[in-house]
């Protein structure tokens, strides 16, 4: 699964370096076997953003992208759109959304996002948002895709703050930014992904990869 993620990330020509950040010797061994650059990080990190921050302490860059190893359907196009978003003035944190499929609308493992007219995230939730009270069919639901881009000051700030109440409740680390007034800008992509969090997710991904769609 990691190989799919690495190769998709490596295909993005705008990235200077692709580094696997891990606290797992098993993953490090896979990296050595394939000749991939990797960094061993602390096993104490509570989130992927904390792990990216540790790497950012040692490697200077304009923008840091986080692509999670459980996203085997990652595509170069995801990263291209995200990097374009980060070129806008004032964007410190960026991520992606895609129209939510009917089966994911009520799935708590598929995180939903609501955005303002200017693309800033208003909220992320495992619940169905927005809620279509009158069942009008006019409420558009968007799924959040777990790709992130950060500038260093935003990473520094995130790691200086404790976990927020909303973050603990939803188990969504990005809510820490919103709780502290840091805007997360969201770009839209037509390319959905399936993060592998459960056995059912794994079966879905295997079926998609088998058909090549």
Predicted feature descriptions by range:
Residues 15, 61, 88-91, 182:
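Short, high-confidence coil segments that cap the C-terminus of an alpha-helix
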Residues 74-164:
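Conserved core of the sugar-phosphate nucleotidyltransferase
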Residues 18-20, 64, 121, 184:
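Hydrophobic/aromatic residues located in beta-strands of well-ordered beta-sheets
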Residues 17, 139-213:
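Conserved alpha/beta core of the MobA/IspD/sugar-nucleotide pyrophosphorylase nucleotidyltransferase superfamily
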